[in-house]
Amino acid sequence: MASLKFPLEILAVFVIISVILLPIAQSHSSSPAPAPTSDGTSIDQGIAYVLMMVALALTYFIH
C-alpha cells in the first residue's frame, strides 16, 4: 500500500493545480466575434411574409 501513496500524492497535487489554473486560463480567452450584419435574407423573408399575408387577405375577400 505504501507504494501507491507516492503516485496518489502526485495525482492529487496535479488535480489541485489543474482546478486552480483552469478557470484562470479560460478567463483570458479572446472576445467573441461581433454579430453579423444583415445579409439581405431577413429582408427577403420579411417581404415574403408580407406578400403571403396580402395573398391570404385577397383570397379571403374574394371568397
Swiss-Prot record:
Signal peptide region: 1-27
Predominant location: membrane
Lipidation (GPI-anchor amidated serine): 38
Propeptide residue interval(s): 39-63
Taxonomic lineage: Eukaryota, Viridiplantae, Streptophyta, Embryophyta, Tracheophyta
Glycan attachment points: 32, 34, 36
Membrane topology of the entry: Lipid-anchor; GPI-anchor
Function text: Proteoglycan that seems to be implicated in diverse developmental roles such as differentiation, cell-cell recognition, embryogenesis and programmed cell death.
GO-annotated cellular components: plasma membrane; side of membrane
Keywords, in A-Z order: Cell membrane, Glycoprotein, GPI-anchor, Hydroxylation, Lipoprotein, Membrane, Proteoglycan, Signal
Name of protein: Arabinogalactan protein 22
UniProt keyword annotation of Glycoprotein present: yes
Keyword Glycoprotein: yes
Modified residues (4-hydroxyproline): 32, 34, 36
Similarity comment: Belongs to the AG-peptide AGP family.
PTM (free text): Contains 4-hydroxyproline; hydroxylated on Pro-32, Pro-34 and Pro-36. O-glycosylated on hydroxyprolines; noncontiguous hydroxylproline residues are glycosylated with arabinogalactan.
Cellular compartments annotated: Cell membrane
